[in-house]
Design a protein with these regions (language model features):
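Extreme N-terminal flexible tails
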Residues: 146-150, 157, 171-212
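Short His-Asn-centered micro-motif
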Residues: 37-38, 60-62, 371
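Metal-dependent phosphoesterase core characteristic of DEDDh/y 3'-5' exonuclease domains
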Residues: 1-31, 49-172
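CheY-like receiver
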Residues: 44-47, 51, 244
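Metal-dependent phosphoesterase signature
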Residues: 26-45
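Conserved beta-strand scaffold positions in the cores of enzyme catalytic domains, especially
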Residues: 4-9, 34, 88-89, 220, ...
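Alpha-helical scaffold/interaction cores of sigma-54-like transcription cofactors
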Residues: 192-946
Length: 946
């Protein structure tokens, strides 16, 4: 009737294994405690059999798990038992799930309750010491007996007489109380043993301490750093990373973002820029007989990969282990690129993943650091067992030999201390070198709170939610030690393991500095045999491409101009010579090819925009449809012989046909050679305020009010970095008043001030990634031979991990394929006119002097006309009342930031309301068409030449 007949507690001695630290944290039983106070397993199994022989049922919470474990142990020890023959009464069933009614079960059902949840449902209170074995048994017993009292079991289940429940209720008229078992505090007992062991280990460490001078003279550099490209996980910008390295006089630094290499090019570029400045300053200092100002920095490109069991298996969530890989040289970098690409294109499942087979395939010229607590060796020490951790270590050592290092960290955490002790033992046993790292996510310790806000933004959490695991908790770093520490701070942390500091320079010395910038590589373009030149095969020349380009250009010129005058010939020869000297004939051939094919597919192609309209070669190839000679457009704006840079042609297609042109390019060059370009969505000033406010639980109204104080397109960094005088020059009076309100808020000590000041740190953080609207990359071979790639949600194409600001410097050919709705409208209109009126219209030959069209512009009726349909432009059209095509061209050029202020003068001069003046009489030749106002870049260039 609910009475305790017998109760026994036993600790079992671990044999051939150790109890992982994470299991010890939950149950309080350490390996040392179990070895000291435990009994052999065989003895405990015999005692369990004695109890089972007296029992009618096996009762428990989720007891199937216990049956499997104990059944295996009986089998392993070759002991017979009644355990699996007895009927089971489980307190964790679909029936108790219906009682507790907790949402979140499979198939829309209620979830099975945990022991704590069931206890809370039955008694209105949680029970203390969950996961203490004695407390668990007592709570399970209480729940089981209460379920009997409430008649939640049938007489058939309990195998009792019909009057049993009446008698049980009489014996227990009130809810069941705890039976009063004595709880052994195993955590305290384990902690006491650990304290004794730690004192012994400290004595041993002091005895083995190496020469202090070796530690003092050792170079320390940070080999484990995350930048803002570890999206929403780090507040460190690339610029900050390099600046912090320089600030602490370190001679190298590594970039090891989570599973991607988005920041690699920016990183090398920033370091190169720093080194250039330092070199100049040091040379200047030496000339003056002064001490050099600083050290040059060696950039170490790395990546912290998620290495799982099978990166192709997407049937279950497997994040794998976090392992740091560093490139020793350019070939190692190329292998990182391959792995980072595979992680996204093949292995992405919740996170980008690779596996050990991928690592084996691309392991050449790679250095491996074993990683943080989520690294394979460390994680297995904590969660699985030291034997399995050793097996993992052996695999990595077999693969990478002396390029494999055990990474130890000191963030003032007990779990790290436990791991480090084992790692040191492994290092001695397997002759693997230790390296000391700090897992850096922010630059300064005071940035820890801002970083925590960033993690909350990532997970959509409030900062007030406690950090921990499970329902009602959120992710967060355990303390504020994850910052870019100085050499002195790191040496102090690792004074008991000085070799971990000394070994770092060995890693740095293994790395060769290399350049990522390169000349643009064009895909091979097939030309007719009669134009091929055998010498090109020997020296990689472009004689054949130049000859073929000249041929098709002059053929096109005959069709465009009929008679090729001396002026046309000179212009063509000048442009072709410039194209030959800059090495870009292939570029024009590639563009001409897909534009011609677009027209063959009945895709509308725009007449041309931007500087490409200044090329007569482009006009003769039908790349553009505007005659540069007619409009005095200069080729030098497009391709300057004195400044060699990649030509840039923006090509408009009707938005419905753009996809077909893309398909043609993919089919021609191969899907593995064509990619779109990634974009990084960053936290702008206003969004950083709103995100921070949400996390801090600042009311939405207040967050919106503060955000509106920031002038459009302004940055918090610039506002707070400017003095009063500079601010007056930056903003108009009404905006300046708002800015001053913002500054006053930041000076306060309330939640609003905290929001603004934290938002300043978060501003500029990468929040998400997207796809460039029109940029397309074409490479000579597999794109992963050049840059890392990823995949995008709405596209089957690869996406470069490098963004638009660096793809060209990285040697990639970039084309802009613009989908223009206006072209689709024109195309549809032509079809409608044909269908309704049987009139054939050719948009390429519409007259540009049609009076009725000008009347539409004069009335401002320009809806649907590309770049003329905004309300502001419509107003100016009404005032201008254009009469010639030059008026429309000029207004298009003027209607943008900067030149806008000249629009009133332009309109007044056209109508004779303002006198047209020229600073010099010679200027009239070039400025007459724009009423004496310099509107176009061509005008500036022509005037400077004159």
């Amino acid at each position: 009737m609910g009475n305790c007949i017998e109760h026994q507690d036993y600790l079992i001695q671990p044999k051939g294994f150790n109890i992982p630290y994470d299991a010890e944290k939950i149950h309080g039983i350490s390996t040392e405690l179990a070895q000291e106070q435990g009994l052999p397993l065989v003895e405990v199994l015999e005692k369990l059999n004695e109890a089972l022989n007296k029992s009618k049922f096996v009762v428990g919470q989720n007891v199937g798990f216990d049956l499997n474990i104990m059944g295996c142990e009986f089998f392993r020890e070759e002991k017979s038992t009644k355990l699996l023959e007895l009927p089971i009464l489980d307190t964790c069933t679909e029936h108790t799930a219906e009682l507790c009614k907790l949402p979140g079960g499979r198939g829309g059902k209620f979830k099975l309750p945990t022991l704590t949840e069931l206890h809370e449902y039955l008694f209105g209170e949680a029970f203390n010491e969950a996961h203490n074995a004695t407390a668990d048994v007592e709570a399970t017993t209480r729940c089981f007996l209460e379920l009997i009292r409430r008649k939640q079991y049938t007489k058939e289940q309990l195998d009792v007489q019909p009057d049993y429940f009446v008698n049980f209720s009489k014996a227990n008229p009130k809810e069941i109380q705890l039976i009063g078992l004595k709880h052994i505090n195993l955590q305290k007992a384990s902690a006491k043993i650990h304290e004794q062991l730690q004192q012994t280990q400290e004595i041993e460490n002091i005895e083995s301490f190496v020469d202090v001078s070796e530690l003092e003279n050792a170079n320390f550099v940070h080999l484990h750093n995350h930048s803002q490209f570890s999206v929403l996980q780090s507040t460190i910008s690339i610029k900050d990373l390099v600046a912090s390295t320089a600030k602490h006089n370190m001679n190298a630094v590594a970039l090891t973002d989570h599973a991607n290499m988005m920041g690699a090019f920016h990183f090398v570029k920033e370091v190169k820029n720093h080194n250039r400045i330092i070199k100049e300053q040091n040379e200047e200092a030496l000339e003056k007989g002064e001490v050099p100002v600083g050290e040059e920095i060696k950039p170490i490109i790395g990546c912290e990969f998620f290495v799982c069991e099978d990166h192709l298996n997407k049937s279950h969530k497997d994040y794998g282990y976090q392992i740091v890989l560093l490139a020793k040289n350019k070939n190692g970098y190329q292998n990182l690129v391959k792995m980072a690409s595979i992680a996204y294109t093949d292995g992405f499942y919740y996170v980008p993943r690779i596996d050990k087979k991928v690592v084996e395939q691309y392991k050449d010229d790679i250095i491996v650091l074993s990683g943080n607590l989520y690294g394979e060796v460390s994680s297995k020490i904590l969660n699985v067992g030291e034997k399995q951790a050793e097996e993992a270590l052996v695999w990595w050592q077999d693969q990478f030999k002396d390029d494999f290092y055990l990474e130890i960290m000191q963030h003032n955490q007990e779990d790290e201390r436990r791991v480090n002790q084992v790692l040191k033992e492994f290092a001695n046993k397997y002759d693997v070198k230790l390296v000391a790292t700090n897992n850096n996510y922010y630059c300064e310790q005071e940035d820890a709170n801002a970083h925590d806000i960033l993690l909350c933004v990532k997970d959509g959490e409030k900062q007030g939610t406690p950090i921990g695991r499970g329902r009602g908790y959120r992710y967060g770093l355990p303390n504020q030690e994850y910052f870019f520490k100085s050499s002195e701070e790191m040496k102090a942390l690792f004074k008991d393991t000085p070799e971990a500091i000394v070994n770092i320079q060995e890693v740095v010395d293994k790395v060769e500095a290399f350049e990522l910038a390169r000349d643009v590589l064009l895909p091979e373009f097939g030309i007719p045999d009669e134009f091929k030149d055998e010498q090109d095969l020997e020296d990689g020349g472009k004689r054949g491409e130049n000859a073929y380009l000249r041929h098709i250009t002059y053929e096109g010129a005959k069709k465009r101009y009929g008679e090729i005058t001396k002026e046309i010939e000179e212009r063509l020869d000048f442009e072709l010579a410039t194209i030959e000297n800059t090495g870009y004939p292939g570029y024009f051939l590639i563009v001409e090819d897909f534009i011609r094919e677009a027209r063959n597919m009945d895709v509308s192609v725009g007449p041309g925009r931007g500087s490409a309209a200044g090329s007569v070669v482009a006009y003769c190839l039908w790349i553009t449809n505007i005659d540069p000679l007619k409009y005095d457009l200069l080729f030098e704006r497009f391709l300057n012989p004195d400044r060699v840079s990649m030509p840039d042609i923006d090509i408009d297609f009707d938005d419905e046909g753009r996809g077909r042109v893309m398909d043609y390019v993919i089919n021609k060059y191969g899907a593995n050679q064509v990619a779109q370009i990634i974009t990084y969505g960053t936290m702008a000033a206003k969004s950083s305020i709103r995100d921070t406010a949400r996390v801090l639980d600042l009311p939405l109204f207040d967050a919106d009010r503060i955000a509106k104080l920031i002038p459009t397109m302004s940055k918090l960094g610039k506002i707070f970095g400017a003095d009063e005088k500079k601010l007056k020059g930056m903003f108009r009076a009404e905006d300046l008043e708002k800015v001053n309100q913002l500054l006053n808020i930041a000076d306060g000590e309330d939640l609003e001030a905290e929001t603004v000041n934290l938002a300043r740190i978060l501003e500029g953080s990468v929040r998400n990634t997207g796809i460039h609207a029109c940029g397309v990359i074409i490479t000579p071979s597999d794109i992963t031979n050049y840059v890392p790639v990823a995949t995008a949600k709405d596209s089957d194409l690869y996406v470069t991990q490098f963004d638009n600001s660096v793809v060209e410097d990285a040697g990639l050919l970039k084309m802009d394929f613009l989908g223009l709705k206006t072209l689709t409208l024109i195309k549809d209109t032509v079809k409608i006119v044909k269908a309704k009126h049987n009139v054939d219209l050719d948009p390429d030959n519409f007259p540009i002097d049609d009076e009725k069209t000008y009347e539409l512009f004069q009335r401002g009726e320009t809806v649907g006309i590309f770049q003329y349909e905004s309300p502001g432009m419509q107003k100016h059209m009404k005032d201008l009342k254009p009469t010639v095509f030059d008026d429309l061209i000029a207004m298009n050029a003027l209607y943008r930031p900067g030149p806008m202020e000249y629009i009133p003068s332009f309109i007044a001069r056209k109508h004779g309301d303002e006198e047209i003046e020229y600073d010099l009489p010679e200027m009239e030749e070039y400025l007459k068409e724009t009423y004496g106002i310099t509107v176009y870049q061509e005008q500036v260039m022509l005037l400077s030449q004159k």
